[in-house]
């Protein structure tokens, strides 16, 4: 979709240390480590009505499990086998970090994810959208691939202990807030455009049906 291509172009430009914003009103980007901005969260929980089990996907981030999953693969193990991910917290899959399996919880409620995942919060809550885009940007995916450990390709992973030690040239927290607002606005516009497109498709389908009745 054109909106997504536009978003990728804007984000690629915005995340380049060489670009200038408003006559360089922000400080020069400095090298720092990811662990300086995150706090690991480890709250054990279970798959319940208060903390329903969700998926972490490369395409859509954190999403509710499908009805089919609950019908066919409902987990019945006792105990707290999962980790809680509160709204705004990130879930991180070490096995698929290089594919972009890192995402914040935008569902609006606390959910449960696989106990294998790492959960972390950002120290500055108003930078969530910046980190959502930065951590899954193309240069970062390449970086994860380069530092992944494991003898077999299909079992390579980037442990959370490696992840937090990644040092990159990063914008100041002030600029992170600015970029976060910009990315959030872009996401909202894209969501509205996609909703409108779905409505138009439904209208088109309905009209086509009426034509051939």
Segments and roles (model prediction):
Residues 1-27, 169-213:
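Amphipathic alpha-helical coiled-coil/heptad-repeat segments
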Residues 21-46:
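Non-catalytic DNA-recognition/assembly elements of restriction-modification systems
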Residues 25, 75-81:
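Short, conserved secondary-structure segments in the cores of folded domains
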Residues 42-77:
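DNA target-recognition patches
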Residues 80-138:
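A short beta-sheet element
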Residues 95, 111-116, 151-174:
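A short glycine-rich beta-alpha junction/loop motif
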